[in-house]
Amino acid sequence: MIDHTHLRLFQFCDSQFPTGAFSHSFGLETYIQRNIIHDDHTFIAWLKMFLQEQLTYSDGLAMRLVYDALENDDTQKVLHIDKLMFVQNLPKETRVGAKQMGTRMVKLALELYNSPWIAWYHQQMQDKKAKLNPAICFTMLGHHLGVDIETIIDYYLYQNVSSLTQNAVRAIPLGQTAGQKIVTHMIPYIEGTRKQIFELKEADFGMTAPGLELNQMAHENVNVRIFIS
């Protein structure tokens, strides 16, 4: 029997889903222009770093904390995490990019599902109390659909791996088959990252590799670009 609940959430993992992820490299393009990333092996090394740093200590841990807040109807906790996700994202392009993607995802989720939490989140943005973040929206959608937090995080990490790989295929460039081999190679690391997220303390929230942030900042000054961030 098909699990429609999981398929509904997995729809948001489609690299063609119109959240704008295809327009953002989150610093990857800077590494490519500096020739630090130039083939599948160097991209995999960067993708592992991105997965184990930004997606672990920022997005992933935020999702775990937000899910607990949803279970306890703690609206102030959700707003607090939303604020931290925005202000700790120091590079302007990635900060604005995450806000744009979060706004698109929230609006699309509202078009597709009648989720009280997502409707509330959107209203908080209109009241200038929230910025909207894709990781938080994805968590709210999964919670609304009755999906467990472990699966929600797995799907979100997969969505990021898939979309960043497709962007690398265009930018390095790589072949489509090479891109699919990379995604297959990364699946075990997704599970390991999720397990690490559940071992973290809340005090670990926001730890990010300085080199990643510096290259995200440097992207503002690249002369030729195909990505917004």
From Swiss-Prot:
Keywords: Chaperone, Cytoplasm, Nickel insertion
Primary location class: cytoplasm
Top-level lineage group: Bacteria
A Pfam short name: UreF
A Gene Ontology term for the protein's cellular component: cytoplasm
GO MF, one example: nickel cation binding
Keyword Membrane: no
Location within or outside the cell: Cytoplasm
InterPro entries: UreF (IPR002639), UreF_sf (IPR038277)
Summary of the function given for this chain in its UniProt record: Required for maturation of urease via the functional incorporation of the urease nickel metallocenter.
Family: Belongs to the UreF family.
Subunit organization: UreD, UreF and UreG form a complex that acts as a GTP-hydrolysis-dependent molecular chaperone, activating the urease apoprotein by helping to assemble the nickel containing metallocenter of UreC. The UreE protein probably delivers the nickel.
Protein name: Urease accessory protein UreF
Organism listed in the record: Staphylococcus aureus (strain NCTC 8325 / PS 47)
